[in-house]
Amino acid sequence: MYFAVIGTHVRGKSASPAMHNASFKALGVNAVYIAVDVPREELPCFLKLARLNLRGFNVTIPHKEEVVKHLDGVAADARAIGAVNTVLVERNLLVGYNTDASAVYQLAGSHMRGADVLIVGAGGAARAALFAAIKAEARAVYIANRTYERAEALAREFAEKFKREVKAVRSPVKADVVVNATPVYDAMVADLSGASLYVDFAYIPTPRTKMVEEAQRLGIKVVDGVDLLVEQGAQAEKIWLGVEPDRTVMKRAVLEFLGI
C-alpha cells in the first residue's frame, strides 16, 4: 500500500513520512508513505493518479480548501469546515475527511468550552480550529488575519452556517485560548497574557516557536505543532487502516526527524 502527503515544498521538510512509516512498521503493515510536491495547477492531475496508485493521502498548504471540489465524497464535518486534510482512496473513489479539526477538538476542546477563543489565520487550519471551537461551545470566537477581508469572509461564512456569532477582528484580541493556525514560527502573532491554553499548528523548522516559548515562559499550557501533527496523523491512520496506532511511536519519529 502507498500513502502520501501533498502540498508545496513538503519533500524533505514534512515530518509526516517519518511519522507514518515508523507507525506502519510498528503495526506490521506493509506500506510506504512519501511526500509529493504538487503545485496548484497540477492538483487535478495528481488526483487522477492517486485514484489508481494510493490507498490514502494527507493534504497540506495550499490544497486543503481547493481539493474539496475534486473529491467523490466528503465527510459531513469536513464539508461544513470547507477543508480536507485526509483522503481515503477506496475502489478508485476519493473520500475526504478533516482530522485537523478532530485533533484540535481532542487536544483543546475541553479548554475551549465556555471560553473566549482567538484564531489567527484564515486558511484550512483556521477553518478546522474554528469548527473545533464551535463544536466545543466556546463562549466567543474571534478570527484575526493579516488580510482582514479574509477573516471577515470566514467569520461571516461560519456564522451563517452554524447560526452563531463569529467575530473578525483587525488585530488579535486577548482570549482564554489562542490558536496560531498559520505557518509563522518566528514572530509574536498575539498577546498571550491571561490565556490558559496556546495551540500552535507550526512545527517546521521547530515546534519551539516564538509563541510557544512565550507561552511556556508565562506558564500557559501548550499544544504544539508536533502534538497536532501526531493526533491528526493517528486519526488518519485509523481511517485508512481501521486500527489505532501508537502515538508514542509516531511522536518519537517526528522528534527524531526534527533533531530534537
From Swiss-Prot:
Its EC number is 1.1.1.25. It catalyses: shikimate + NADP(+) = 3-dehydroshikimate + NADPH + H(+). GO terms for biological process: amino acid biosynthetic process; aromatic amino acid family biosynthetic process; chorismate biosynthetic process; shikimate metabolic process. The keyword NADP applies. InterPro entries: Aminoacid_DH-like_N_sf, NAD(P)-bd_dom_sf, SDH_C, Shikimate_DH, Shikimate_DH-bd_N, Shikimate_DH_fam, Shikm_DH/Glu-tRNA_Rdtase. The active site is at K64 (proton acceptor). Shikimate binds at S14, A15, S16, T60, N85, D100, Y203. GO terms for molecular function: NADP binding; shikimate 3-dehydrogenase (NADP+) activity. Pathway: Metabolic intermediate biosynthesis; chorismate biosynthesis; chorismate from D-erythrose 4-phosphate and phosphoenolpyruvate: step 4/7. Keywords: Amino-acid biosynthesis, Aromatic amino acid biosynthesis, NADP, Oxidoreductase. It holds the Pfam family Shikimate_DH. NADP(+) binds at G121, A122, G123, G124, A125, N145, R146, T147, Y148, E149, R150, F201, G225. The keyword NADP applies. It is an enzyme of class 1 (oxidoreductase). It comes from the Archaea. Homodimer. Belongs to the shikimate dehydrogenase family. Involved in the biosynthesis of the chorismate, which leads to the biosynthesis of aromatic amino acids. Catalyzes the reversible NADPH linked reduction of 3-dehydroshikimate (DHSA) to yield shikimate (SA). This is Shikimate dehydrogenase (NADP(+)). It comes from Pyrobaculum neutrophilum (strain DSM 2338 / JCM 9278 / NBRC 100436 / V24Sta).
